[in-house]
């Protein structure tokens, strides 16, 4: 990014293509994982996370879905109730969660995480 202006920074993030927005989906790792994999990693479906900020702080659950368009993730157990009583998932920004265990079924992800460590 070239400009320092906050409005242009926000615009660049908003208008970025999806392969660039993937880089904004990183979350900090727990202390147990940090020694092996570094400070942060991209969140994928299946990772176990704990919510660190907001009304649902302390809630632990698996990542059920993620949206690159809005830059949010959906964690099981984090929901709000509508007026009619139905529960709807509450999207959370990845920076507000901490990854406690990684989904390692993907060999490509394992090579990415162990690269340069």
Curated annotation (Swiss-Prot):
Keywords annotated in UniProt: Ribonucleoprotein, Ribosomal protein, RNA-binding, rRNA-binding
Gene Ontology cellular component list: large ribosomal subunit
SUPFAM superfamilies named among the record's database cross-references: Translation proteins SH3-like domain
Superkingdom as given in the UniProt entry: Archaea
GO biological process: one example: translation
UniProt cross-references to InterPro entries, sorted A to Z: KOW, Rib_uL2_dom2, Ribosomal_uL24_CS, Ribosomal_uL24_euk/arc, Ribosomal_uL24_KOW, Translation_prot_SH3-like_sf
CDD domains, A to Z: KOW_RPL26
Molecular function via GO: rRNA binding; structural constituent of ribosome
Protein family per UniProt: Belongs to the universal ribosomal protein uL24 family.
PANTHER family: 60S RIBOSOMAL PROTEIN L26 FAMILY MEMBER
Assembly: Part of the 50S ribosomal subunit.
NCBIfam families: rplX_A_E (TIGR01080)
Described purpose of this protein according to its UniProt entry: One of two assembly initiator proteins, it binds directly to the 5'-end of the 23S rRNA, where it nucleates assembly of the 50S subunit. Located at the polypeptide exit tunnel on the outside of the subunit.
Name assigned to this protein: Large ribosomal subunit protein uL24
Protein's organism: Methanococcoides burtonii (strain DSM 6242 / NBRC 107633 / OCM 468 / ACE-M)
